[in-house]
Each structure stands twice: as C-alpha cells, then as structure tokens.
Amino acid sequence: MEAPPVTTMPVSGGTINMMEYLLQGSILDQGLESLLHRLRGLCDNMEPETFADHESVYLLKGQQASPFVLRARRPLDRPGAPWHLRYLGQPEAGDRSRHTLVRNCVDIATSDVLPEFLQEMGFRMDHEFVARGHLFRKGVMKVAVYKVFRVLVSGAAEGAEPLSLSYLVELSAVAPAGQDNIADEVRGFAEQLRPLVQLEKIDPKRVM
C-alpha cells in the first residue's frame, strides 16, 4: 500500500505530528464483490488500485514493559519500488465517545537494505505476512480491502497461503494532530457501508 499523502501544511520546529483515524472490520469471501461494487459507487471517480505487499513486523525489546514495534513492507507487484518503514503508536486513551481509533502514524520510504538496517539496530523479526487486495480513495480517506496470507518459509512471499476465508476492511485517514473532525467523516462513511460490513474501533492490544 502507498504511504499517506504528503501534507502541504507548514512545518514549524520539526516534523508534523500525523495521526491515523481508523476503523476496521471483515467480510467473508462471498461478500467481496458486493462490497467492491458499493465502494466503486461511493469513492472518488477513479479505478481502485490493487496491491500485493509483503510486510515484516520487527520488535526491539528493552527495559520497557512492551517492545518497540516497527513494520517494514515492500510491494511484490512493483519491482524496484521503495520499501516502507512504518511506526504505529498506541491508541490514544482520550474520549471514549470518539468515533474512531486514533494513533500516531509515521510512514517513510526507504531503500531495500531496510531489513539489514533494522537487524543491525537490534530489532528482531517477530512475524511476516502478505496482504493482497484493493485500495479505494474518498478525499483524505482510503479504504483497503485485502486478504492476509501466511508466509510458510521466511522471506518466501510467493508461497504464502490464505490465512482465512475472509477479507479485512480498513477505513482510515491520516492528518495532522488536532483535526478530530476527520473522525466524524470516517464514521459517516463507514455508516454508508452497512450492512455489507460493520466497521468498528478495534484495540490492537485486544487481538494480539
């Protein structure tokens, strides 16, 4: 999947603190075409992108209670495209009535020596998977509908097998901190996808 769009807002005193507003759900294989048809009608007037990404999750264990996590991913369908390094912060506690999960998000393009660099820094790969699916856009929002594949032999993404009989659905938007009105937009769009898919706030710690 592509990195979040570059913001045109001025930067003062360093980089902009970007936040991801996220809702997630799943849909059975037999419901995929109906959902894709609905998304084509609701999203921007352009053909949806397809993607096939190989993602590895790296951990750095220290004195803190939980390890520091970074994600390295590379596109399998675009040879020569850059790798991406992604950091996803812990969900903000904040107001329980907030319509989406909100977390800090950093996504940068890197060279193909990223895995070696992370290992030299002391990170160890925890797990890896392949994600294949479709990407739709609606303004600042994007909808990823994808199937997760289990990598049977480390590094051999080509032989990956489907993990389940369903597709994950992620509706997200990335924006500078403080723009909580985006959460309302994300929730409003999610309502338009019912009853095909139920998108909710899912705490990653509860599914690990």
UniProtKB/Swiss-Prot annotation:
Cellular component terms (Gene Ontology): core mediator complex; mediator complex
KW Nucleus (keyword) present: yes
Example GO molecular function: transcription coregulator activity
Superkingdom of the source species: Eukaryota
InterPro entries in the cross-refs: Mediator_Med18
Stated role: Component of the Mediator complex, a coactivator involved in the regulated transcription of nearly all RNA polymerase II-dependent genes. Mediator functions as a bridge to convey information from gene-specific regulatory proteins to the basal RNA polymerase II transcription machinery. Mediator is recruited to promoters by direct interactions with regulatory proteins and serves as a scaffold for the assembly of a functional preinitiation complex with RNA polymerase II and the general transcription factors.
Protein name according to UniProt: Mediator of RNA polymerase II transcription subunit 18
Species whose genome carries this gene: Xenopus laevis
Gene, per the UniProt record: med18
